[in-house]
């Protein structure tokens, strides 16, 4: 889809800053519906896979299913896998010890902005009919899905379990509140993993940390209000707030009874 506009700068910055000091071979696996991407005819480590542009929120909900299409390739050709949002941009050098999860961390990593002071404020899915549901009072960290990764075997397991959760919800006509991110948080609940700070994935429009090593570019600068139309953000947010208020009323009534 239209996110392909971010690819060239992502690739250039990744080549320069991400693990550029190590002996690892960086393989790029790009899912897109365009016929050609920057440097694919030059760099043999760029692998483009056709993926039709799905409507929102299917493109998010189907993320794990899409990645698993190349499961055998990942297992055969990689030791570690890292996923970065399409609008990611590296700004400073990131070396292996910073990014590599160890055995004590389950060989998995994810990003957390750590911007909540109370786990009751975590935007977990609270819908008891969703496989992504996390009850109030549970969980210590809320993870952002813009960066995930780990040793290939463990990461493929993450993809498979999250896909299974998503498939069950899809069959039951249930949509997790924040789609793939909600399912990621359910999978990672109470697991010990490597947690990346906002320094490794700061929204471009934020002012702190002042010198991040990687940012998520502001999509509104590129797409403007069109991004709202793509996601139906206004109506969806109003609906979510309404549902959350109704849940609180129901829970309060149950307590009073």
Give the ranges of each region predicted by the language model:
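Catalytic core and acceptor-binding pocket of nucleotide-sugar-dependent glycosyltransferases
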Residues: 131-220
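A conserved donor-nucleotide-binding helix/loop in the catalytic core
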Residues: 51-84, 92, 179-184
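Short, solvent-exposed loop/turn segments at secondary-structure junctions
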Residues: 1-2, 35-37, 53-54, 88-90, ...
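Active-site regions of enzymes building and remodeling cell-envelope glycoconjugates
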Residues: 41-54, 64, 98-109, 211-215
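Long, low-complexity C-terminal extensions of enzymes
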Residues: 214-257
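Conserved donor-nucleotide/metal-binding helix-loop-beta segment in metal-dependent transferases, i.e.
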Residues: 90-127
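N-terminal anchoring/stem segment of glycosyltransferases
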Residues: 1-59, 70-77, 239-257
């Amino acid at each position: 889809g239209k996110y392909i506009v971010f690819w060239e700068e992502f690739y250039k910055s990744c080549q320069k800053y991400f693990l550029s000091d190590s002996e690892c071979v960086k393989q790029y696996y790009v899912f897109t519906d365009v016929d050609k991407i920057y440097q694919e005819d030059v760099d043999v480590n760029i692998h483009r896979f056709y993926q039709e542009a799905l409507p929102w929120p299917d493109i998010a909900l189907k993320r794990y299913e899409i990645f698993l299409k190349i499961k055998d390739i990942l297992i055969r050709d990689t030791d570690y896998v890292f996923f970065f949002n399409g609008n990611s941009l590296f700004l400073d050098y990131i070396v292996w010890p910073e990014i590599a999860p160890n055995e004590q961390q389950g060989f998995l990593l994810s990003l957390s902005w750590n911007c909540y002071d109370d786990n009751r404020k975590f935007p977990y899915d609270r819908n008891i009919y969703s496989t992504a549901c996390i009850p109030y009072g549970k969980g210590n960290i809320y993870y952002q899905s813009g960066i995930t990764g780990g040793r290939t075997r463990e990461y493929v397991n993450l993809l498979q379990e999250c896909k299974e959760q998503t498939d069950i919800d899809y069959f039951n006509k249930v949509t997790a509140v924040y789609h793939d991110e909600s399912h990621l948080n359910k999978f990672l609940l109470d697991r010990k993993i490597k947690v990346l700070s906002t320094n490794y994935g700061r929204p471009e429009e934020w002012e702190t940390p002042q010198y991040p090593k990687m940012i998520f570019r502001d999509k509104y600068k590129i797409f403007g209000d069109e991004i709202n139309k793509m996601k139906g953000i206004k109506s969806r947010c109003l609906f979510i707030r309404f549902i959350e208020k109704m849940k609180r009323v129901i829970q309060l009534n149950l307590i009073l009874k």
